From Swiss-Prot:
Pathway: Amine and polyamine biosynthesis; S-adenosylmethioninamine biosynthesis; S-adenosylmethioninamine from S-adenosyl-L-methionine: step 1/1
Key words of the record: Autocatalytic cleavage, Decarboxylase, Lyase, Polyamine biosynthesis, Pyruvate, S-adenosyl-L-methionine, Schiff base, Spermidine biosynthesis, Zymogen
PTM: Is synthesized initially as an inactive proenzyme. Formation of the active enzyme involves a self-maturation process in which the active site pyruvoyl group is generated from an internal serine residue via an autocatalytic post-translational modification. Two non-identical subunits are generated from the proenzyme in this reaction, and the pyruvate is formed at the N-terminus of the alpha chain, which is derived from the carboxyl end of the proenzyme.
Coiled coil segments of this chain: none
Protein known as: S-adenosylmethionine decarboxylase proenzyme
GO cellular component: cytosol
Organism: Drosophila melanogaster (Fruit fly)
Catalysis performed (reactions): S-adenosyl-L-methionine + H(+) = S-adenosyl 3-(methylsulfanyl)propylamine + CO2
Cofactors that this protein relies on: pyruvate
Recorded name of the encoding gene: SamDC
Amino acid sequence: MLENGSHFFEGVEKLLEIWFEESSNGDDDLRNISRSDWENVLSNVNCQIISTSKNDIIDAFVLSESSMFVSKRRWILKTCGTTTPLKCLGQLLKLAEANGYNVVADLFYSRKNFTRPEAQITPHQGFTEEVTYLDSIFPNGRSYCLGSMNLECWYLYTFSRSDIKITPQLISDEKNVDSDPDQTIEILMQDLDPETMSIFYKNKFNDANGATVKSGIDTILPTMHIDDFLFDPCGYSMNGINDKGEYMTIHITPENQFSYVSFETNVALSNYRKLINQVINTFKPGKFIVTIFANKCSLAYETMKELEVEYSQGSHWKRTDMQCCNFPSYNLLFAQYSHSEKTGDYL
């Protein structure tokens, strides 16, 4: 709530992803952690599990504030509102250790700048505070800000064991933490089309499936098995997982004054241009940010450079910012677009 009593909800999410090093026991698996243990972890975040879906490779959880994904040695938590995901790290690491994973290989914490930062709760009242909190657990972490700090920006904190200088006696113990191909694309959208957003109100559809089909969400990545939820009176979340263990997730805050939609997937593609166009055509934002992470084993590691080209020339999108970063194990592309009056393809 705002100080004057008017309604507000922070759609911008905090995204936390952790990869653990392979354990010596092949039977170790984060998916062995019980639901009750996950509920205890999430109680520190101030969110609850609404529904679950799973296959042989990945477990997906729709939460009261966004989503969680668990695979053998990877954990992803994405939460919106005034949630506090960093506060669950201590408990999470203890659970992981109890299930055979005692070394973090890579950690990523990221978020866009908040619409109402003053409404957030410690340790999320500012990126400096978040970095201080993370540094207390991961003393070799690194923090970044991409985009314009006084306008729209995207914050990132990373930790990687490959950043740590390995002494000779530890070389024989060093694992290949980059053995699994990994890529993630996020599309963060604002100022959405009101007619499209009206689909995600309970007075329009009684169940989430109606909104999923009407909006065309089900056609974005057709191989995904969808678990969706429509909030009362408005708002929408969905998780999709496929037989390869890949995921997608969409979260929608439809209120016109602060509309926000996030799309995320780790589907491996050699070119993300078509996918970006489909997502943007589905939700029709006024502006959006694209981020793509890809490690050296990923199909997208080299081909993500396609988006470094100014595809928006001649279209009704103007690229207002673009930055690339090279990390020890990953490449990152950040690009921001705003609407112009021209017509044509989105990218």
